[in-house]
Amino acid sequence: MTESDVAESIGDIVSRLNNALDDLETKKNQTPSVLKGPTVSQERPSAPYRQKIEKLSAEVVDSNPYSRLMALQRMGIVRDYEQIRDKTVAVVGVGGVGSVVAEMLTRCGIGKLILFDYDKVEIANMNRLFYQPNQAGLSKVEAARDTLIHVNPDVQIEVHNFNITTMDNFDVFVGRIRNGSLKSGKIDLVLSCVDNFEARMAVNMACNEENQIWMESGVSENAVSGHIQYIEPGKTACFACVPPLVVASNIDERTLKREGVCAASLPTTMAVVAGFLVMNTLKYLLNFGEVSHYVGYNALADFFPRESIKPNPSCDDRHCQIRQKEYEEKISSEPITLDIQAPEDEPIIHEENDWGIEVVDSDTTEAPSSSAATEVAPGLKFAYEPTQTPKKNSSDNLKLSPSQAVTKEWMENIRDALLEEDRLKKEQNKRK
């Protein structure tokens, strides 16, 4: 092959490569934009729509996003709603439940949110709430932050895009629990919204180690039931005190998954569980109502069981056992105060009315009514007074009319005559 033939072959190859590249570029441009995975830089939003609000106001105007929240204070539900701006909450798992929880807390005006997740937004997530199709390809924590700063720019949002179950990341997670608050101290609450037991055990271990109160949540694989649980180390059962079968059997969850098979998911169930979790969070942070220790949800029967689970003295988590001993010592050292008051016999007060109706005790003897007509209301009187019928205790107390007395005497005479006739017949029979 001559040199000219080689050059011609190379030129032909280059030409075909250029044509192939042109075809690929054409097909790329024809692909719907929703299927493209946008880069993080493409999805960065513009600046927040308003300036930060320094102090909450109850003024009812269209431009005040806090007026309806502050109404809780005016109605006596919450004593000081503004203290929510001093609270820091960590949300572990920003998926179907966690993303809605983060949004609700942001709308409620929480001071700071710390988000933990390592997953990315996918088109398959669109059957759930919060995320948008144009956020596909972004990390969930970044997409959540980009959305939440527009919902409420007053909330400080910190994100961590990693898996907390690895050793190094677990240490960072514990560090943020210890020093992640607005004042660089311990945070107020941890919310677990993860979808696997390994991550739940990691959160449980960290919170037991730091003596951190947290709340756990979950939705069943068939998407028609869920639960939330309040966990206070030492006082209530931790996640390891009553472990599910998968954890108790030391089964690796990853071995249970099958290719092409996924769990069911309904935005309705996730929204209900997220609502319960945030409501319990608000009651705990703002100190109103009753914080539920466990609330279940069965969508098929609209059943909401509530339970209170005590800690397991034989829990496998050593930090849980330590917290149990600390709690028992705390309870035993507190003085027992008995607030016993003698019952007072208070008279029953009945509401006055315009009809002269009075409620009296059943043992009270009614006074005889006067001959004068009773005034029922101003200008209204009875046409006549009802007669009182005497009580009939026995036949001796009966007062008979003259005709009744004659009839009674006549009946007694007949009875005596019949008795006498019967006596005479018996005597005659004896003689015979």
Swiss-Prot record:
Zn(2+) binds at residues 238, 241, 315, 320. Residues 29-44, 386-406 have a biased composition (Polar residues). Residues 25-47, 363-406 are annotated as: Disordered. Keywords: ATP-binding, Metal-binding, Nucleotide-binding, Ubl conjugation pathway, Zinc. GO terms for biological process: protein ufmylation; response to endoplasmic reticulum stress. The keyword ATP-binding applies. One of its GO terms (molecular function) is metal ion binding. Interacts with ufc-1. This is Ubiquitin-like modifier-activating enzyme 5. The gene is uba-5.
